């Protein structure tokens, strides 16, 4: 599993990279990386078909712990998954926009 920073994530998003947020829906509604798709970690394996296998997918949570575990799951299922170190918290601390 690869890892990336929020700065690298911002550049990837500018290029159209997909982002999957594995937090619970209530957490997601409180604020998320713009354009992220919410697939809670408990639903990830049954919703794999919603994720594009042909492109690297960035995986985010609040701090990077859940997303790290879920990036491993995606990698094991044939995806090129990239964990976002520090998660949404690091994204917000960097001053980047939060979508609600």
Regions found by a protein language model. Name each.
Residues 1-18, 24-56, 65-100:
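Rhodanese-like catalytic fold shared by cysteine-dependent sulfurtransferases
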Residues 60:
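Short, surface-exposed ligand- or partner-binding patches at beta-edge/loop junctions that are enriched
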């Amino acid at each position: 599993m690869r890892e990336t920073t929020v700065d690298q994530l911002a550049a990837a998003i500018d290029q159209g990279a997909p982002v999957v947020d594995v937090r619970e829906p209530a957490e997601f509604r409180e604020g998320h990386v713009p354009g992220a798709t919410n697939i809670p970690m408990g639903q990830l394996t049954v919703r794999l078909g919603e994720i594009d296998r042909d492109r690297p997918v960035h995986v985010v949570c609040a701090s990077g712990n859940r997303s790290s575990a879920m990036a491993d799951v995606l990698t094991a299922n044939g995806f090129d998954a990239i964990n976002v170190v520090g998660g949404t918290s690091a994204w917000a601390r960097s001053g980047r926009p939060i979508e609600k």
